[in-house]
Amino acid sequence: MRIFILGRTKYQEAWALMKRIHDEVASGVSEEMILVTEHDHVITVGRHGRLNNVLRRELPIYVVERGGDATYHGPGQAVVYPVVRLRGGVRSYLWALEEAVIRTLDKYGISAGRREDHRGVWVGGKKIASVGIAVERGVAYHGVAVYVNPHMEYFYHINPCGLPPSVITSMRQLGVEADVFEVGYAVAANLETLLQRQERLKTRCESLRRIP
């Protein structure tokens, strides 16, 4: 598994690259990869989302394959797109994505966690990272966005994941200054470690099932 830092990208370019890599991984002609990027201003809406959660239509809008509802991406967000085979179920993979963010934030002195009623990573009642994936042919893509130091006013263009815009926070709002790509790389590295552990556990369980 390799980690690539793409730098700042337009959403449609990263989306096309991610889908191409997905097809190659699913076909067995490419290794798994984790892409780290930061997008120009854009709004995406997941496959089960509602366009009426986009409150203002001034930014480019893309309806995409991932789960979830309306999300804003832009400068100041560390966006991590793993293109990886599922080691277990979707729920265990989503747990690993969230856990990679939680462990990263802990290194910056931020105590974060989960909520049972909403996906993502939370600090108190505020959302600091959004998660949304798609799975096709056993390979996951799309991923997670961590709010490092984004332009907070743009979240008022949407109801983020169907929630009020005021629910969003960032590392900067919590008093932590950090580099977007350093945060993104740390999330990717933590995720790689977690997925390797899931792979070892899966292999061990399969070996036990083969014992007569």
Curated annotation (Swiss-Prot):
Disulfide bonding pattern of the chain: none
Catalysed conversion reaction: octanoyl-[ACP] + L-lysyl-[protein] = N(6)-octanoyl-L-lysyl-[protein] + holo-[ACP] + H(+)
Leader peptide range in chain numbering: none
Annotated active site: 161
GO biological process: protein modification process
Pfam family, one: LplA-B_cat
Pathway annotation: Protein modification; protein lipoylation via endogenous pathway; protein N(6)-(lipoyl)lysine from octanoyl-[acyl-carrier-protein]: step 1/2
Residue(s) at site: Lowers pKa of active site Cys: 127
Domain BPL/LPL catalytic: 28-199
InterPro entries: aa-tRNA-synth_II/BPL/LPL (IPR045864), BPL_LPL_catalytic (IPR004143), Octanoyltransferase (IPR000544), Octanoyltransferase_CS (IPR020605)
Major site of localization recorded for this protein: cytoplasm
PROSITE patterns, per database record: BPL_LPL_CATALYTIC (PS51733), LIPB (PS01313)
Domain of life according to the entry: Archaea
Record flagged with keyword Transferase: yes
One cellular component term from this protein's GO annotations in UniProt: cytoplasm
Additional notes on this entry: In the reaction, the free carboxyl group of octanoic acid is attached via an amide linkage to the epsilon-amino group of a specific lysine residue of lipoyl domains of lipoate-dependent enzymes.
Function: Catalyzes the transfer of endogenously produced octanoic acid from octanoyl-acyl-carrier-protein onto the lipoyl domains of lipoate-dependent enzymes. Lipoyl-ACP can also act as a substrate although octanoyl-ACP is likely to be the physiological substrate.
HAMAP family: LipB
Family: Belongs to the LipB family.
Protein name: Probable octanoyltransferase
Species, as recorded: Pyrobaculum arsenaticum (strain DSM 13514 / JCM 11321 / PZ6)
Gene, per the UniProt record: lipB
